[in-house]
């Protein structure tokens, strides 16, 4: 007897990838995620490859993982994939201190974010 298999978190024609601790604010990552929402997966990879935003590097890695999951784990057609969902949220925040004059210090906040990308296979029209 083994443990029952957990139900899928996405639909049958969908694949998921999550980047959990991406160094940077959720606001900056959401700007990059907005560039690829609803686009074809191949076009989204090109947009991220030529984007000047620093967060595009990490977003491209998560998208590449979602495409690989679709191809290898769920046997979906890579050419028919569309970025169905690209949601961003906050993760941890590292706290650091910066020493200042007269024996004082100030707090530095170093935010991390999460990126969840779902790709869906669509029929060519």
Swiss-Prot record:
Highest taxon listed in the record's lineage: Bacteria
UniProt GO cellular component terms: cytosolic large ribosomal subunit
Keyword Transmembrane helix: no
This protein's record includes keyword Metal-binding: no
MF terms in GO: rRNA binding; structural constituent of ribosome
Keywords linked to the UniProt accession: Ribonucleoprotein, Ribosomal protein, RNA-binding, rRNA-binding
One GO BP: translation
Oligomer status and interactors: Part of the 50S ribosomal subunit.
Family per record: Belongs to the universal ribosomal protein uL22 family.
Function: This protein binds specifically to 23S rRNA; its binding is stimulated by other ribosomal proteins, e.g. L4, L17, and L20. It is important during the early stages of 50S assembly. It makes multiple contacts with different domains of the 23S rRNA in the assembled 50S subunit and ribosome. The globular domain of the protein is located near the polypeptide exit tunnel on the outside of the subunit, while an extended beta-hairpin is found that lines the wall of the exit tunnel in the center of the 70S ribosome.
Record HAMAP family: Ribosomal_uL22_B (MF_01331_B)
The protein's name in its UniProt record: Large ribosomal subunit protein uL22
Organism annotation: Novosphingobium aromaticivorans (strain ATCC 700278 / DSM 12444 / CCUG 56034 / CIP 105152 / NBRC 16084 / F199)
């Amino acid at each position: 007897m083994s443990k029952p298999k957990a139900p899928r978190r996405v639909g049958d024609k969908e694949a998921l990838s999550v980047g959990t601790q991406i160094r940077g604010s959720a606001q900056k990552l959401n700007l990059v995620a907005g560039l690829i929402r609803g686009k074809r997966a191949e076009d989204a990879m090109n947009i991220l490859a030529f984007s000047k935003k620093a967060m595009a590097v990490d977003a491209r890695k998560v998208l590449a993982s979602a495409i690989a999951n679709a191809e290898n784990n769920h046997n979906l057609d890579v050419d028919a994939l569309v970025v169905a969902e690209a949601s961003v949220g906050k993760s941890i925040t590292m706290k650091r201190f910066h020493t200042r004059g007269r024996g004082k210090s100030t707090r530095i906040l170093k935010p991390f974010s999460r990126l969840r990308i779902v790709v869906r296979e669509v029929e060519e029209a």
